[in-house]
Amino acid sequence: MHTSRRFACQSALALSPDARTLAVVSDRGAGTYEAWTLPATGGRPERAVGVAEHAVRSVCWSASGELVAAADRGGTELDQLYARHPDGPSRPLSVDPAGRVQRLLSWNAASPDGRLVAFSSNARASTDMDVHLVDLASGTERPLLTGAAWHVVGGWSPDGARLLVMRVLENTTQDLLALDARGGEVREVTQRAHDVSHVPAGWLADGRALVITDEGREHLWLGALETATGAWDAIDAPPHDVELAAASANGRAFIWSVNEDGYSRLRWRVDRAATRERALDGGVCEDLVLSADGSRAAFVRLSATEPWQVWTLDTATGEARVALTSSFAVPHEELARPELVRIPAADGAIPCFVYRPRNARGAVPAVLYPHGGPEAQSRPAFGAHLTHLAALVHRGIALVVPNIHGSTGYGRSWQSAIHKDWGGIDLRDLRAVTEWMRQQREFDGARLAVYGGSYGGFATLLCVTHMPDAWRCAVDVFGVANLVTMLENAQPNWRRFLSAWIGDLEKDRAKLVERSPITRIEEVRCPMLILQGENDPRVPKEESDQVVDRLRGLGRRVEYVVYPDEGHGFTNRANADDAYGRIVEFLTRELVGS
């Protein structure tokens, strides 16, 4: 599951009102993320929206022809909104000069008449996200829905009278509201008697909401929800998760993606016709949008053997084509699809993708790569920021990429098992995967490493503190080290979620201390590389500082690099190249030799 799309409804893609032009967020120009436009059938991209010293994160296109973009500075995730008409320059739309306000721009934020854009803002209170409306012509902004909650825009009804809004309570619990766009009635659409996920995907022409939900099921399914009565009609309830969905602005078409053991399958309907589908040939759908009239879809396709690509799909004919592609540093013929392995473990078999170097002779070194989140999923593909992993395989290093408990894509129970159990069920899974790696004759047990970022950094620190003799080296990228200080130092907009995800500072303090890797940091034996963004709003820099200070005090070998203009990830290409280059060189040096 893709967190930014699922819980913020954001997209790095947009289609113009006539479906002829595609907007894409890319760092292809000056080395930072900007909005580019190109013909939907493919062609030369042109810069559309770029903001000095800012990185564009998401876009949407209004019926008036204006392209709206959200951009932040220095990785702070405090997005400002900008707009550009095709005949003019980009201009500020909703901007806080002090840069203290966070905004979320959904892919379907523009009203059907092209006059208004709805977005989330914490201008009133740093802990909450209210729904605001801004007039594209005048720039006039006003709040539409306020309250002590995190609200995310989920789309306008085709007649422009109502807004669908998601109220995020936890990663596995969301409610839906239907708002009168003029500022009147607020209807509670989902009457939550128990924890249920409800992720909006827009409106249908008959006035029902298109929703991804796990109501009554273990896996996420796609349904049509009557907002007045709460009655459901199932559209697609496969034995796998529905991961992404989008309805056209006119409600006459919709498209969705099903996650089948990590691989994606697209399905769509137009004007009540039969469902059509398209497999992505070993690929993964990372982003998905639909034009206002439903005639064309755009999606990002990822693969383990091909570079990042943007595709467009004609929903009438089913014809799909590549509109934009990037490149791999590793030659195409040297890339290979991973094998899906299920590793036995006490709490259930762990799905794991294993990448093996081509033409390997003898036992090879291997890297364990736990993903971030933890409520996310490693897919059988290399995204834009994971191509360096392909470089490791190219250099003769195997990759073992597990989806341990807490991962999405395998049902609600698997995902929610991590709640308030960081350092518990996940550590048991990591032990099982590590032991499996040590038993494989194809891997050199004396040359194993662990590398992860964000929650994956926490998992890395668990591994090196609880299984210190297993690792030749380790890489921690903005990982959580101390569960207590993580909760104490969290930004206000994250605090309401962290107590449900990690634990309560007062009630669970003893367990949090015991489960924190920093408590056992003296157990670390292997050399480490640690990378951190100075402005990280999710995992504060203090987390990495603690680890580095303690390791250096113990005389351990540790390399530490802080990027002053980055946050939770890398939005500047020069920084990304430096960081991923350091990771590849460090792991190659320690596992293979110079």
Language-model regions: role of each:
Residues 289-296, 300-594:
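Serine-hydrolase catalytic core recognition
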